[in-house]
Amino acid sequence: SDCFGRYDPTSTGPNLLPWSEWLYYTQFGDDNRLNKVFPVLAAYYKWLKLNRTWRNGTYWSSGWGTGMDNMPRVPEGYNTIYSNGHTIWLDACLQQIMVANILLKMGFYLERWQEIEEFEDDIKNLSAYINKNMWSERDGFLYDQYADDSLSTTQGIYAYWALHTDVLPKQRLDRLVEHLDDTCKFNRPHRVASLAADNPKYKANGRYWEGGVWPGTNYMVVSGLVEKGYRRLAHDIVMNHYNNVLKVYKKTGTFWEYYAPEDAAPGFMARKEFVGWNGPPPNADLK
């Protein structure tokens, strides 16, 4: 049975169902389904706002909570997987902005005004905070923010949830996107590495989220690039990912949980037979 701990940082995952439901609706126009799922999706957004925010309205999570178990994000002394690290988690903030925008579209269409009346202010306030406090002008990158207001130095793929929002002005977004083409960062033999290659924790075999190439985050990056007009870069990444997945399939006869960033090979301790997880994304990316 489903269960959660209201104050357990690992008990909830990324709030992505509104994204999938909206894509489903735009393709099939199922009004009955949209009417059924909207109140649940709106309620969960509000639950996260109530139970996963710091007092300034920004969001927290954890390694497990973001789905990126061992990504090196929290300060020393905190558990990488289980702790929120007294940190403002960039992807959790960006995902809530994305979701609020989607719920606004749903709410306007369904004329459910009362359930979405504060969402525009949420988007405005959270976007302003990220731009002012979580952007490094020196690095041209978005980071998590620690309790002492300093920024993390970890450059992770989670920053590219910004592509699914209007948080960054064009000049800043261009700089963020440039890192995807940088061979010292995310442009490795198999794209897109989940952790920048110049990070001390980066592993050639991926070691899960210490550089591993994951189908879900690749889909997030590619679809965001297309949405924001970076179509050439999106095409290059798609073809690279598709060809690497195909090479590994020809060698092993199966699809894998995730892949190594430095070679056409499964990632370290990756599980095989992940067809539902890794079979569709290359084809979805190609479309």
Enumerate the language-model features and the residues they cover.
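Residue-identity detector for glutamine
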Residues: 27, 95-96, 114, 145, ...
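Leucine-rich amphipathic alpha-helices with coiled-coil/heptad-repeat character
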Residues: 24, 48, 52, 103, ...
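Extended glycan-interaction surfaces of carbohydrate-active proteins
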Residues: 1-8, 53-87, 128-213, 246-287
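Active-site neighborhood of glycoside hydrolase catalytic domains
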Residues: 90-130
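A short structural micro-motif
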Residues: 43-47, 125-129, 182-183, 240-245
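A near-ubiquitous, low-amplitude feature marking generic local secondary-structure context
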Residues: 31, 79, 113, 145, ...
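Aromatic-rich carbohydrate-recognition surfaces in CAZymes
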Residues: 1-67, 89-93, 97, 212-234, ...
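Structural helix-adjacent loops and short alpha-helical linkers that scaffold large soluble proteins
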Residues: 24-42, 107-124, 166-180, 225-239
